[in-house]
């Protein structure tokens, strides 16, 4: 069983518990009481003559690396990343595999003005309603984790709720699927979710196949200034970086604004 298989199997258990805790109808009723989401999509648009925008990830651990940040403080981390010039935050909410928390997202959203992406593995529409209630401005939809009909329906639902959707792909077939189902923000994950191996050439090879009017995001494995130069030259609008910002003084020294 792959990493992704194990994660998705556990997500189904989480969703079953979520449905018992609060039915979809109640989530739908609560939407009217919320403030409008911040514009995640607009925050990623690359200004003329500027470099890629930074989505800074608030991440404590991962299945492949274990604990990444010993003294984890999501607000302190977000503050550092905002000072670096981040355009948006990505907050891990998966608890079982990444030691994330819904509370981390709430805290970051409440303390800062930047748009916030809920980074999790969505397998059910109820998780999208939940993301909206948590204060997320955007969600992650992983093509490898969803059927075609799910991807299409979840893109439509997120739009109805005012949420941006970062649609993640890893190869050409997944990219074609994302485009066919109506994605407008494309994330190319350099990490293979089956075995968690990383190759940053994945994003560079796929970039020419992403329409120029879409927002293109390079994700995972970016740890050196040379990596940023490469995806910058390839024409990406933004990068999503978590562990790299924590461990690399090179990345932290770059000018992101």
From Swiss-Prot:
**Pathway listed:** Amino-acid biosynthesis; L-tryptophan biosynthesis; L-tryptophan from chorismate: step 4/5
Asked whether the UniProt record includes Lyase among its keywords, one would answer: yes
What EC class does the entry list? lyase
Q: Which GO terms describe its molecular function?
A: indole-3-glycerol-phosphate synthase activity; phosphoribosylanthranilate isomerase activity
Q: One GO biological process from the UniProt record?
A: L-tryptophan biosynthetic process
Gene3D superfamilies documented for this protein = Aldolase class I
Catalyses which reaction? 1-(2-carboxyphenylamino)-1-deoxy-D-ribulose 5-phosphate + H(+) = (1S,2R)-1-C-(indol-3-yl)glycerol 3-phosphate + CO2 + H2O
**Organism superkingdom:** Bacteria
Q: What is its EC number?
A: 4.1.1.48
Q: Which UniProt keywords apply?
A: Amino-acid biosynthesis, Aromatic amino acid biosynthesis, Decarboxylase, Lyase, Tryptophan biosynthesis
Family, as annotated: Belongs to the TrpC family.
Under which name does UniProt file this protein? Indole-3-glycerol phosphate synthase
């Amino acid at each position: 069983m792959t990493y992704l298989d194990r994660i998705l199997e556990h997500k189904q258990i989480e969703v079953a518990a979520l449905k018992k805790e609060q039915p979809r109808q109640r989530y739908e009723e609560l939407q009217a009481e919320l403030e409008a989401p911040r514009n995640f999509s607009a925050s990623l648009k690359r200004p003329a003559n500027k470099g890629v925008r930074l989505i800074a990830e608030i991440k404590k651990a991962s299945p492949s690396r274990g604990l990444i940040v010993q003294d984890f403080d999501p607000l302190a981390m977000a503050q550092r990343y905002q000072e670096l010039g981040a355009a948006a935050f990505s907050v891990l909410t998966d608890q079982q595999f990444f030691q994330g928390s819904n509370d981390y997202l709430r805290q970051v959203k409440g303390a800062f003005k930047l748009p916030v992406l809920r980074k999790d593995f969505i397998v059910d529409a109820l998780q999208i309603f939940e993301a909206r209630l948590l204060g997320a401005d955007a969600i992650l939809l992983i093509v490898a984790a969803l059927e075609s009909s799910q991807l299409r329906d979840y893109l439509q639902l997120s739009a109805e709720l005012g949420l941006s959707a970062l649609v993640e792909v890893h190869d050409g077939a997944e990219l074609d699927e994302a485009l066919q189902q109506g994605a407008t923000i494309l994330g190319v994950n350099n990490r293979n979710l089956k075995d968690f191996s990383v190759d940053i050439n994945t994003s560079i090879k796929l970039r020419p196949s992403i329409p120029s009017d879409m927002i293109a995001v390079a994700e995972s494995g970016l740890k050196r200034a040379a990596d940023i130069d490469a995806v910058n030259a390839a024409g990406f609008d933004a990068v999503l970086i978590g562990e790299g910002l924590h461990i690399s003084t090179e990345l932290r020294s770059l000018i992101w604004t």
